[in-house]
Regions:
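Phosphate-backbone binding interfaces of nucleic-acid-interacting proteins
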Residues: 557-676
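A glycine-rich helix N-cap at a beta->alpha junction
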Residues: 77-91
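N-terminal catalytic cores of NTP/NDP-binding nucleotidyl/phosphoryl-transfer enzymes
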Residues: 2-75, 92-110, 114, 131, ...
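Cys/His-rich short segments
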Residues: 116-188
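Beta-strand segments within the central parallel beta-sheet cores of soluble alpha/beta enzyme folds
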Residues: 319-323, 502-504, 600
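Helix-rich, typically C-terminal accessory recognition domains appended to large enzymatic cores
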Residues: 378-414, 421-527, 633
Length: 676
C-alpha cells in the first residue's frame, strides 16, 4: 500500500448550499478517511472545490436577474464556510472559475486534441433565433410524451421521471424567450468512449471485482454491457471554460470534462502554496488515488474521467471509487427544488457547537450500500442515548472521579487484560476504514465506550475507595486508558470532541499504529485538566421546531405558488351570491391631493357612472388607467376616503415584482356584465 494518498471529494455544485445528503454521502466519509490516513502517517492531499459551470447556474442567474459569476460567488462562500464549520479538513478547497483551472483544463483538452483523441461531429440542435443562441436541454420546455406534463425539460420530465431528448418533447419552446426553437447544425468534439471499453473492462471488471463496492462495480458493468458511445466534450454555451481552438467561438468545455480536471488543477494550486510536486500525486504509481462521490456520479468518475486520463496518457487510475447511495429525509427524497432538505449552514446556526452530533448521526446512517433515512427523532436519540448516555457519560465519570479522589492525577495502576480491548478496537477501526466501512468503524468506537461503562459498573470505584483504595486506583487507571483511547480514536469521526478530550486529558495526538499496541496511553501521575460536559441533551422542543420547519415546507410544496397567502375563512354559497362583480371602464383618472398613493376614478359600470378611490398610484399613472376595462365590486357599501365618497372597489392583483395589475376580461365586452 502506497505511502501517498490523493483523496478527492465530488465538487459541490455552486447553485445552492450543501445539505445533509451531500454530507452523509460524500464529504463526512471522505473527511473521516483523510483524517484517518494522516493518522496512519500517510502523505495526504485531500482536495475539493466548487463546480461553477453548467446550465443550472445560468438558469438560476437568469431567474434572479444576476450574472452566473454573481451566483457562483455567493454559493461558493456559503459552501466553503459550511465545510469549515463542520470540520471538513480539505487541504485545498478551490473553484472551477479560477485562472489555474482554466489553464489546466485547456491544456488537458489540447493534449487530447493533438493526440487525435476527439472526433468532430455535426449534429442538429435546437436554436433560439430571438436569443441568438443554441439551447441546452434544460433551456427547452414542452409537453412530456409519456405523461402529458406541460412543464417537461429537454432532458427529463420531473413529474413522471422519464429521461427525454429535446426532440421528443411535444410543442417545444425556448425557456429563454418562449419562442418555438428551430433545429440548426452545430459542430462539437466528441470523445469516442467505445474506444476505451477494453481498457475499462480489464481495469475495473476484471481487476476490481473483489475490492470495489457492488453498487459501483454493478453500474460500471451495466454501462459496459450496453456498449459505450461517443459523448460530446464541448457545448454551445457562453458560460464555462472556452474551447481553446480557433474555430470554436461560442463553445465551452462540457462541464463533466472540466469539473474532474478540477481535482488536478486544485492539487496544483495546493502544491504551489506548500512547496510540493503535484505530479507525485497524479502521475506517480506510488500514490493511491481515491474518489469519494455519490452514486449519480459513478459514470463520470469510473468511465468518462478515466477514459480522459487514459487518452491523455500521463495519469494514474483511481485505486477505488467508494460511491455512496442517497440519504432520504423523514422518509422522503431530499429535493433542493422543493426545499426538502436540512441545509448545512442552517444546522450550524440552529445547533451551535454541536457539529460532531451531526457528523456522528450522519455517519451512523451513512448510505454506504443502499439508500438510508435521516429523521430528527433518530438524530435526537443518537445524541441523547449514545453520545450523552454512553460516550460522554463514561468520559465524565472517569474525569470527575480522578479529580475527586486523586486531585486530577492518573492513579497508580498496571496494564491488564482490559488494555487489549483498546488495541483490538484500534485494529478493528483501521480494518473497517481501509474497506470504506464507516458505519462499522463508528460502531467499534462506540462499543469501546460501552465497554468502558460496563467496566466501571463492574468495578464500582466509588464504592471500593473506602475499603480497597488500590482497587479504585487500578480501575480508574484503566478507565483513564480507555478514555484517552476514545479521545484519540474519535478524531477522524468527531474532531471537535477529540480536541476537547485531548486538552481535557492533557495529551498529544498519537499515530494510529501506537493505538494498536497493548501498552498504556497515559502514565500514572499524569495531570489532567478540569472536566467539562462533552455533549448535552437535546430537548423535545428543539426537535419539534425542526420537524415543524419541515412540515411548513411540505405545506408550501402543496401550493402552486409558495408565496401565496393562506386561504381566508371559508364562506357559504349564499354569502358569495351577495357579491356583485361587474365589468366597467375607467372614464377619468386623477391624483388625490396630498395623498401619494391614491387615485380618483370616474367609472362607467353599465349601471351608472360612479366615483371610486383606489390606493394604486405607486403602480399606475392616471394616464395609464383611462380607457382601461376593469372589474368592480359594485355593491360594496360606500365609504369616505380623504373626504371623497368611494362607491365600489376595483379588482387588482400583485405581480412578482410587487407592482399591481388590473384584473381584466380577455376581450373587451359591454360594461355591467355580471361575473360569477
Amino acid at each position: 500500500m502506497s505511502k501517498r494518498k490523493m483523496i478527492t471529494a465530488a465538487l459541490p455544485y455552486a447553485n445552492g448550499p450543501v445539505h445533509i445528503g451531500h454530507l452523509a454521502g460524500v464529504y463526512i466519509p471522505a473527511d473521516v478517511y483523510a483524517r484517518f490516513q494522516r493518522r496512519m502517517g500517510k502523505d495526504v492531499a485531500f482536495i475539493c472545490g466548487s463546480d461553477e459551470h453548467g446550465i443550472p447556474i445560468t438558469i438560476r442567474a437568469k431567474k434572479e436577474g444576476v450574472t452566473p459569476q454573481d451566483v457562483v460567488d455567493k454559493y461558493h462562500e456559503i459552501i466553503k464556510k459550511s465545510f469549515e464549520d463542520l470540520g471538513i479538513s480539505f487541504d485545498e478547497y478551490s473553484r472551477t472559475t479560477s485562472k489555474k483551472h482554466y489553464e489546466v483544463s485547456q491544456e488537458f483538452f489540447l493534449k487530447m486534441y493533438h493526440n487525435g483523441d476527439f472526433i468532430e461531429e455535426v449534429s442538429e440542435q435546437y436554436f433560439d433565433e430571438q436569443a441568438g443562441e443554441f439551447l441546452a436541454d434544460r433551456y427547452i420546455v414542452g409537453t412530456c410524451p409519456k405523461c402529458s406534463n406541460d412543464g417537461a425539460y429537454g432532458d427529463q420530465c420531473e413529474k413522471c421521471g422519464s429521461t427525454l431528448s429535446p426532440t421528443e418533447l411535444i410543442n417545444p419552446k425556448s425557456a429563454l424567450s418562449g419562442n418555438v426553437p428551430v433545429l440548426k447544425e452545430t459542430k462539437n468534439w466528441y470523445l469516442p468512449l467505445n474506444k476505451y471499453e477494453n481498457f475499462l473492462t480489464e481495469w475495473i471488471i476484471k481487476g476490481h471485482k473483489d475490492d470495489w463496492k457492488p453498487n459501483v462495480y454493478g453500474q460500471v458493468k451495466s454501462w459496459l454491457n450496453d456498449g459505450l458511445k461517443p459523448r460530446a466534450m464541448t457545448r454551445d454555451l457562453n458560460w464555462g471554460v472556452p474551447v481553446p481552438l480557433l474555430n470554436a467561438e461560442g463553445k465551452v468545455l462540457y462541464v463533466w470534462f472540466d469539473a474532474p480536471i478540477g481535482y488536478i488543477s486544485f492539487t496544483q494550486e495546493w502544491a504551489e502554496k506548500n512547496g510540493k510536486n503535484w505530479k507525485d500525486y497524479w502521475q506517480n504509481e506510488n500514490c493511491d488515488l481515491v474518489h469519494f462521490i455519490g452514486k449519480d456520479n459513478i459514470v463520470f468518475h469510473c468511465i468518462i474521467f478515466p477514459s480522459m486520463m487514459k487518452a491523455h496518457g500521463e495519469y494514474i487510475m483511481p485505486q477505488n471509487v467508494p460511491a455512496f447511495e442517497f440519504l432520504n429525509l423523514e422518509n422522503d427524497k431530499i429535493s433542493t427544488s422543493r426545499n426538502w432538505a436540512v441545509w448545512a449552514h442552517d444546522y450550524v446556526a440552529d445547533f451551535p457547537g454541536q457539529q460532531d452530533v451531526l457528523r456522528y448521526a450522519l455517519l451512523s446512517s451513512a448510505p454506504e450500500t443502499k439508500d438510508n433515512n435521516f429523521t430528527w427523532k433518530d438524530f435526537q436519540t443518537k445524541n441523547n442515548s449514545e453520545l450523552v448516555g454512553i460516550f460522554g457519560n463514561f468520559i465524565n465519570r472517569v474525569a470527575v472521579l480522578i479529580h475527586k479522589y486523586y486531585n486530577g492525577e492518573i492513579p497508580q495502576g498496571t496494564p491488564s487484560e482490559e488494555i487489549k480491548e483498546i488495541s483490538k478496537t484500534a485494529t478493528e477501526i483501521r480494518e473497517f476504514l481501509e474497506k470504506y466501512e464507516f458505519r462499522n468503524a463508528l460502531s467499534s468506537l462506540m462499543n469501546l465506550a460501552r465497554f468502558g461503562n460496563q467496566y466501571l459498573q463492574t468495578e464500582e470505584p466509588w464504592k471500593t475507595i473506602k475499603d480497597s483504595p488500590e482497587k479504585t486506583a487500578q480501575s480508574l487507571y484503566i478507565g483513564a486508558q480507555i478514555a484517552v483511547a476514545l479521545a484519540q480514536m474519535c478524531e477522524p469521526f468527531m474532531p471537535f470532541s477529540s480536541d476537547k478530550l485531548l486538552k481535557m486529558f492533557n495529551v498529544e495526538k498519537l499515530q494510529w499504529i501506537d493505538l494498536e499496541k497493548e501498552t498504556e496511553l497515559v502514565s500514572a501521575g499524569h495531570k489532567i485538566n478540569e472536566s467539562s460536559l462533552l455533549f448535552s441533551k437535546i430537548e423535545d422542543d428543539v426537535i419539534e421546531a425542526q420537524i415543524q420547519k419541515l412540515e411548513q415546507t411540505k405545506q408550501n410544496n402543496k401550493k402552486t405558488n409558495p408565496n401565496a397567502n393562506p386561504m381566508k375563512e371559508q364562506i357559504n354559497f349564499d354569502d358569495f351570491a351577495k357579491i356583485d362583480l361587474r365589468t366597467a371602464t375607467i372614464l377619468e383618472a386623477e391624483k388625490v391631493e396630498k395623498a401619494d398613493k391614491l387615485l380618483k376614478f370616474k367609472v362607467d359600470t353599465g349601471v351608472d357612472i360612479r366615483t371610486v378611490v383606489s390606493g394604486i398610484a405607486e403602480s399606475f399613472t392616471p394616464e395609464e388607467c383611462i380607457g382601461k376595462q376593469v372589474m368592480i365590486l359594485l355593491n360594496l357599501a360606500p365609504r369616505k376616503i380623504r373626504g371623497i365618497e368611494s362607491q365600489g372597489m376595483l379588482l387588482l392583483t400583485t405581480k412578482p415584482d410587487g407592482k399591481l395589475s388590473f384584473v381584466t376580461p380577455d376581450d373587451k365586452i359591454e360594461n355591467g356584465v355580471e361575473i360569477g
